[in-house]
Amino acid sequence: VTTFCTMTTDARADIAQRLRAWQDKAYRTLAFACAPCEEIRTTGLTLQAIVAISDPIRTDVPAAVDQCRQAGINVKMVTGDTSATAIEIARQIGTWGPNTPAEAQITGPDFAALSDEEAYNRVQRLRVMSRARPTDKQRLVNLLQRHGEVVAVTGDGTNDAPALNHAHVGLSLGSGTSVAKNASDITLIDDSFNSIVKAVMWGRSLYKNIQRFLYFQLVVNVAALLLVLAGAAIGTELPLTVTQILWINLIMDTFAAMALASLPPSAEVMKSKPRRQTDFILTHRIQWAIIVVGLLMFAPMLAFLVWCERETGANAGMDVHELTLFFTTFVMLQWWNLLNAKALGSDHSAFHQLLSDRTLLLVMLLVLVGQWGIVTFGGEMFRVTPLSFKEWGVIILVTSPVLWIGEMLRLLRKSPSPSLPRGERG
């Protein structure tokens, strides 16, 4: 507006200085000018006033940005404001620091002037883009995607629509335009950046819960498969009947899926870095855990199976009582391992916030009561016979090391390694 006004050079310089000072404080400025005229004029106006408007950031934004940084999420600010205003806002939210290099900021026209190769090499280091146009935002998204990044874009205006549409996840604001909402995948009703952080936490927690269920189910299947194969190799009848396997794989696994999927989200997942899109859901660590735990369950059960086959002649084979002990022991091993599955991928104890995981406790109770009901009343259908309370106590006791060994391993992993004096370090 000042370019349309008639004023002295000194006055114009004074106004420019004031504007820079306000922009450095992240103020947005609005100028008023007038002139007597019968039609619109763009020259000879008289400057009336300049207003500096403060649009303070929300108090929860800096903490949310810091959470993103800890989670390995790189936050970039793209705005139509001037460079000075954009950098000050970035400083307030925590994406710009005193040691941030100048090349981490660029204007939209300068970004458009870069060649594709130059922009590609620089785009990951950018933190602030000012005076950005719709094409600049879209180009930024496309270049980040070429680097293999998963890109989420927030916006509320019509000019944000191209970037929202091309991003992996487009997030429009509830107060935004209908064009932005139609181009986005998710609408933030509360217009809060913190909601994005919560969505990431929920998504990562759900992914972790799926890993936990797969770990639990595959341990059951590995151990059961090995036992069936071992029984065939030894020449004995199947140690687990079809109905027993149905109870283990169908009912128990369904309950376990409900319990593990309902575990509440944990802020702990925000301390880990993002996974690659090509990563297999079962990490090498989980795969080894499935194999090792499955074998550790298989070994004592195999020893029990061999011991039950110790007799020869007319009494050869496992009687119903021994089959019941075998079946119940196997189920209780999985019952204890459900707590290990809860703590999978965490350094916390399996008992951490256990009382708040009511669905898990309910499922464990249902499995325990269901197993008791099958053993007590299953009869010929499940090929079982009732067990005494003493036998139940012994089975629960001898199978509990599955949990205690897991607890010790988590404790050792959580404990910091003792530091060596400087002279003893390699």
Identify the role of each PLM range:
Residues 164:
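Basic, alpha-helical nucleic-acid-binding regions used in initiation and control of genome expression
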Residues 1-143, 147, 161, 173-175, ...:
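Cytosolic catalytic headpieces and adjacent flexible linkers of membrane translocases
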Residues 334-338, 402-411:
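Alpha-helical transmembrane segments
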Residues 100-153, 167, 174-346:
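Membrane-embedded transport module
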Residues 300-304, 365-380:
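Hydrophobic alpha-helical transmembrane segments in multi-pass integral membrane proteins
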Residues 376-393:
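Extracellular/periplasmic helix-loop-helix junctions in multi-pass membrane proteins
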Residues 282, 286, 346-366:
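C-terminal membrane-solvent junction of multi-pass transporters and transport-like membrane proteins
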Residues 414-426:
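Intrinsic disorder/low-complexity segments
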